[in-house]
From Swiss-Prot:
Keywords: Cytoplasm, DNA-binding
Region (Disordered): 86-109
TM region(s), chain numbering: none
Protein name: Nucleoid-associated protein MADE_1013280
Lineage of the organism: Bacteria, Pseudomonadati, Pseudomonadota, Gammaproteobacteria, Alteromonadales
Family label: Belongs to the YbaB/EbfC family.
Location of this chain's protein in the cell: Cytoplasm, Nucleoid
Highest taxon of source: Bacteria
Species the sequence originates in: Alteromonas mediterranea (strain DSM 17117 / CIP 110805 / LMG 28347 / Deep ecotype)
Function: Binds to DNA and alters its conformation. May be involved in regulation of gene expression, nucleoid organization and DNA protection.
A GO-annotated cellular component: cytosol
Molecular-function annotations in GO: DNA binding
Self-association and partners: Homodimer.
Pfam families, sorted: YbaB_DNA_bd
Biased segments, Pro residues type: 99-109
Length: 109
């Protein structure tokens, strides 16, 4: 009886691992965009943190260099936050909302 139950648990774990791998593959191609300065600076990255684009509104090119740098940093931070939220949401679909320990990171994230 225990043996059959353990086999079932192992099978479920394998299925969950396969679903998690599929979600990770999907996230690698999913793009999110972080913004700062009311959308004047945008950073687009995949959910595995590869930056695809950085867009800076032309009107900022004549502004203070420090301000533009701050806006770029804020847009990057916003993009990273959005990646984390999207990844958590997609992984939650796989884990069925199973609570994970605080600070627990899924492999590949």
């Amino acid at each position: 009886m225990f043996k059959g139950g353990m086999g079932n648990i192992m099978k479920q774990a394998q299925q969950m691992q396969e679903r998690m791998q599929k979600v990770q593959d999907d996230l690698a191609n999913l793009e999110v965009t972080g913004e700062a300065g009311a959308g004047m600076v945008k950073v687009t990255m995949t959910c595995n943190h590869n930056v695809r684009r950085v867009n800076i509104d032309e009107s900022l090119m004549d502004d203070d260099k420090d301000m533009v740098e701050d806006l770029v940093a804020a847009a990057f931070n916003d993009a990273v936050r959005r990646v984390q939220e999207t990844s958590k949401e997609k992984m939650g679909d796989v884990t069925g909302g199973m609570p994970l320990p605080p600070g627990f990171k899924m492999p590949g994230f």
